[in-house]
Amino acid sequence: MTREMTGAEMVIQALADQGVKHLFGYPGGAVLPIYDALFAQKDVKHILVRHEQGAAHAAEGYARSTGKVGCLLVTSGPGATNAVTGLTDALMDSIPLVCITGQVPTHLIGNDAFQEADTVGITRPCTKHNYLVKRIEDLPRILHEAFHIASTGRPGPVVVDIPKDVQFAKGLYSKPKDFPHIGYQPKVKGDLDKIKAAVELMASAKKPMFYTGGGVVNSGKHASELLRELVKLTGFPITSTLMGLGAYPAADPQWMGMLGMHGTLESNMAMHDCDVMICIGARFDDRITGRIDAFSPGSKKIHVDIDPSSINKNVHVDIPIVGDCAHVLEDMVRLWRTGAKQADKKALGDWWKQIDKWRDRKSLAYRQSNEVIKPQYAIQRLFELTKDQDTYITTEVGQHQMWAAQFYGFQEPNRWMTSGGLGTMGYGLPASVGVQLAHPKSLVIDIAGEASVQMTMQELSTAVQYRLPIKVFILNNGYMGMVRQWQELLHGSRYSESYSEALPDFVKLAEAMHAVGILCEKPGDLDHAIKDMIDIDRPVLFDCVVDPAENCFPMIPSGRAHNEMILGDAADSLDSAITEEGKMLV
């Protein structure tokens, strides 16, 4: 069934038909017809952000915590360009977004009109796909196609750029079922022969290792359930990338902790020494592999990924399997069960003994203090006091992000929202706005740094406006901590522009925005202050003043292999451990 509508009305109707409940945006001249159509309906609730980057990150948080497509609406020119950072972030981390942008009228495109920008050209490298809609007849198909592309295959952001005259034009609107999307149908079922070969290789392993990533989370909760079943069936150890945290429970004894530059010693050493690596939904990025030519040199590698371009891109693998993680894991579980497969118990037992020796090194250990709050301790206490609640965590980017990954134990998928690939400072606060809207009864905490959070601090006002009781837990060390750490370790402690000399009073800043501010400076006061934060049913800025000199360990020096990892007690040797080539990789 078709109905005549304006282009602006089609946009809102398409969002409603796609199940969109919340739309993050900021109005401007080139999208006023869409905002007028928005005013006339009640199906889609608009959330007015303070900056278009905030709209993109809020949509990311919404999408990552629900598995649904996140949506944003921005005007032409600076509205679209302000959203580019968030779009790039979503592309790097495989987050499904649909971004509707306004554009100058079609007859003015290319004339340097007011607030004109080549949105399609600018966003081509940072989107999964983008469109410039020149005809009203194409608009319904493109809108529905955008959701299909964003949410299938490897998820990602899609931009639909709509000139203002197309928004005013009238045409016939059709619902999603009228468009079969025959042009884009990514492969979800893995090749069965390759899956059989993978299972046979797994059964022959002496020192196996599961290496999982954000693709498991993106595949849905069933994928996480199947992963847990397969890990239990095999008895193999498992690690994860930053983006994959929560797909496997951190409390389980087979969990090795996070992998990579700031991962645990046991996970990195096991990856280096394993003989069979089962990579599921990860992409072998540089923060995971360390030096490529020394990455897990003795292992046969199985790689499961829905994106064929990710396979053999960075690391050559022996058994490539293109398919959705849930579908492939289902086949793996079935074949392991029906084939009555069993790992070599003696070899696996010896492997676990070696892993326990690495665990005994306690690579995440740090020196406690009764005088100053250690950032690791702050995260540990935050975890202990919130783990029994319905909690979602977002982060900014920096040392605090790594400490959160190391010390906050995630038991379920979709509970951890962070900027992994792009490393976007300012991601966490607006992302928490999106998460809180999606989960209004849940406890949503942004673990932040005092430098990073200032990138998008204005979005606290958004939380206040919509009565979203987000908690911003700031680890305040007075520095851009990760920058300071690298300057200390690589540049002779020459702290060039990494000290935040004019920090705001976060308590007063919170109060100025009609939120609540809390200051905590002593370890003995921390538990009580965190409990107060949790109990307050309003947005809270929690200024947790931590040790300014604390560094984030363990770490793999840039350009080094996994078995060259340095623990905190060996930090003095780090400068000599990093090669000149490695310094370029920081």
Label for each model-derived stretch:
Residues 1-2, 137, 200, 205, ...:
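Phosphate/pyrophosphate-binding active-site segments
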Residues 8-20, 61-67, 91, 149-154, ...:
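Glycine-rich phosphate/diphosphate-binding loops that line cofactor/substrate pockets in enzymes
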Residues 11-12, 16, 20-21, 29, ...:
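Active-site diphosphate/adenylate-binding microenvironment
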Residues 21-25, 44-47, 65-104, 211-212, ...:
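A short, small-residue-rich loop immediately preceding and capping a beta-strand
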Residues 64, 214-302, 410-441, 454-457, ...:
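Glycine-rich, anion-gripping cofactor-binding loops and their flanking helix/strand elements
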Residues 100, 108-109, 114-115, 268, ...:
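Thiamine diphosphate
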Residues 101-142, 164, 244-353, 530:
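Glycine-rich, acidic loop regions that bind phosphate or pyrophosphate groups
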Residues 145, 149-204, 364, 567:
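Conformationally flexible catalytic loops at phosphate/diphosphate-handling active centers
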